[in-house]
């Protein structure tokens, strides 16, 4: 979160307090919890205890927090409330394939404290159960093929609103599939790197080793259009998360038409940022490439992708376009897709093809939107 956003948030909090409103303590990050308890005359370790109650035990009342003194619990209850996000809607895939496997993708509508809505997706398979979570309400980048970009941008999610999505989907995974989440992907609504402070805070909570829910950093993937400064910050943070870059074209003009941000972050700048990330982390990135008929699926497009991919340490993940009724894009045809893949393989590149899941309930890549797409 930028400094001006933080100051605006604090001004809002002070204004609400002056009007006698109790604020949601889950708005506060770990650092802010420490500052709060210090102001209340408590030792710093109390913040860790409070954080554990909120995010490991997922307490809903301060009275439950037995490791805190009664006086502190009463003080907190007089000024704060505990208000996690809530599940308000579910849509489940009912295709023949999903019914046969018994692993239907499910999309969840989640209501936040201010009544804003966000979507998350549970993607089960035989090997894993993946939570696809959002980092923003809407998205300011306005990629032309993406439903989220067309719904506009409302605000960043707080760290707790991000973790709440995971907690809600973990409960649904246990209930529906009798096993918990194995992977988390930041591939829902929004650009995670535009909300990096809260994304990193949420990852810190979700990977806390002795919490009731804890997942390895290596099981988390952050997807981005490729913001160089923020990519460098992730690389130097020491995080072991995976990084996926939404490339979609290795032709500068085509990429600009698909993704307006590409006018500022050119392919040369992106390659430089990826090389820096590779150098710092010694890890490859995944280049995500969505095939669109007549736009980026020609043999020449494949040749350009080969040239770009050979400039960086990467693997390539090809995905089909998931149709959106109000947009005119079409997925690449099977014959052009086959030839495209073969060109990449012949060039010695590592290629995977992502099986689309959730398209029939608008839960697949690029389809999430809590407002109509115009």
UniProtKB/Swiss-Prot annotation:
Q: Subcellular localization, per the record?
A: Cytoplasm
Q: Where is the composition biased (Basic and acidic residues)?
A: 1-17
Q: Enumerate the SUPFAM superfamilies for this protein.
A: Radical SAM enzymes
Query: How the cofactor binds, per note?
Result: Binds 1 [4Fe-4S] cluster. The cluster is coordinated with 3 cysteines and an exchangeable S-adenosyl-L-methionine.
Q: Which InterPro entries match?
A: Aldolase_TIM (IPR013785), Elp3/MiaA/NifB-like_rSAM (IPR006638), Methyltransferase_A (IPR040072), RlmN_N (IPR048641), RNA_MTrfase_RlmN (IPR027492), rRNA_lsu_MTrfase_RlmN/Cfr (IPR004383), rSAM (IPR007197)
Provide the disulphide bond pattern: 132-365
Instruction: Note the SMART domains from the entry.
Output: Elp3
Residue ranges spanning the membrane: these are none
User: What are its E.C. numbers?
Assistant: 2.1.1.192
Any one GO molecular-function label of the UniProt entry: tRNA binding
For region Disordered, the annotated ranges are: 1-22
All residue ranges annotated as the Radical SAM core domain in the record: 125-360
**Record field: catalytic activity:** adenosine(2503) in 23S rRNA + 2 reduced [2Fe-2S]-[ferredoxin] + 2 S-adenosyl-L-methionine = 2-methyladenosine(2503) in 23S rRNA + 5'-deoxyadenosine + L-methionine + 2 oxidized [2Fe-2S]-[ferredoxin] + S-adenosyl-L-homocysteine; adenosine(37) in tRNA + 2 reduced [2Fe-2S]-[ferredoxin] + 2 S-adenosyl-L-methionine = 2-methyladenosine(37) in tRNA + 5'-deoxyadenosine + L-methionine + 2 oxidized [2Fe-2S]-[ferredoxin] + S-adenosyl-L-homocysteine
What Gene Ontology terms describe where this protein resides (cellular component)? cytoplasm
Asked whether the UniProt record includes Transferase among its keywords, one would answer yes
Q: Does the keyword Amino-acid biosynthesis apply?
A: no
Q: In which residues is S-adenosyl-L-methionine bound?
A: 190-191, 223, 246-248, 322
Q: Which UniProt keywords apply?
A: 4Fe-4S, Cytoplasm, Disulfide bond, Iron, Iron-sulfur, Metal-binding, Methyltransferase, rRNA processing, S-adenosyl-L-methionine, Transferase, tRNA processing
Sorted alphabetically, the Gene Ontology BP terms of this entry are: rRNA base methylation; tRNA methylation
Family matches, as Pfam families:
Radical_SAM (PF04055), RlmN_N (PF21016)
Q: Where is the active site?
A: 119 (proton acceptor), 365 (s-methylcysteine intermediate)
What's the further remark here? Reaction proceeds by a ping-pong mechanism involving intermediate methylation of a conserved cysteine residue.
Main function: Specifically methylates position 2 of adenine 2503 in 23S rRNA and position 2 of adenine 37 in tRNAs.
Provide the family line. Belongs to the radical SAM superfamily. RlmN family.
What is the protein name for this chain? Probable dual-specificity RNA methyltransferase RlmN
Q: Which organism is this protein's natural source?
A: Chlorobaculum tepidum (strain ATCC 49652 / DSM 12025 / NBRC 103806 / TLS) (Chlorobium tepidum)
């Amino acid at each position: 979160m930028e400094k001006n956003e933080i100051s605006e948030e604090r001004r809002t909090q002070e204004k609400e307090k002056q009007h006698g409103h109790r604020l949601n303590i889950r708005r506060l990050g770990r650092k802010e919890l420490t500052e709060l308890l210090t102001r209340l005359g408590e030792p710093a370790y109390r913040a860790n205890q409070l954080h554990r109650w909120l995010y490991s035990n997922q307490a809903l009342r301060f009275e439950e927090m037995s490791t805190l003194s009664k006086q502190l619990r009463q003080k907190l209850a007089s000024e704060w409330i505990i208000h996690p996000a809530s599940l308000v809607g579910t849509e489940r895939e009912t295709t023949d394939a999903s019914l046969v496997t018994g692993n239907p993708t499910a999309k969840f509508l989640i209501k936040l404290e201010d009544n804003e809505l966000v979507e998350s997706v549970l993607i089960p398979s035989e090997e894993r159960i993946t939570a696809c979570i959002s980092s923003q309400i809407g998205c300011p980048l306005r990629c032309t093929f993406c439903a989220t970009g067309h719904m506009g941008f409302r605000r960043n999610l707080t760290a707790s609103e991000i973790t709440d999505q995971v907690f809600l989907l973990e409960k649904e995974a246990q209930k529906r599939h009798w096993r918990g989440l194995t992977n988390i992907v930041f591939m829902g609504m929004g650009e995670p790197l535009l909300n990096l402070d809260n994304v990193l805070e949420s990852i810190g909570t979700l990977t806390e080793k002795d919490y009731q829910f804890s997942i390895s950093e290596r099981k988390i993937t952050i997807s981005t259009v490729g913001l160089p400064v923020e990519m460098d910050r992730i690389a130097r943070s020491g995080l072991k998360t995976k990084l996926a870059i939404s490339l979609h074209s290795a032709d500068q003009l085509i990429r600009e038409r698909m993704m307006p941000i590409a006018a500022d972050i050119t392919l040369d700048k992106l390659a430089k940022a990826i090389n820096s990330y590779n150098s710092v982390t010694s890890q490859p990135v995944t280049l995500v490439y969505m095939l669109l008929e007549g736009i980026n699926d020609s043999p020449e497009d494949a040749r350009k992708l080969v040239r770009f991919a050979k400039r960086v340490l990467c693997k390539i993940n090809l995905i089909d376009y998931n149709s959106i009724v109000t947009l005119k894009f079409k997925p690449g045809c099977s014959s052009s897709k086959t030839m495209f893949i073969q060109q990449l393989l012949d060039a010695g590149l590592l290629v995977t093809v992502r099986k689309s899941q959730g398209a029939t309930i608008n839960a697949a890549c690029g389809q999430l939107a809590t407002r109509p797409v115009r």
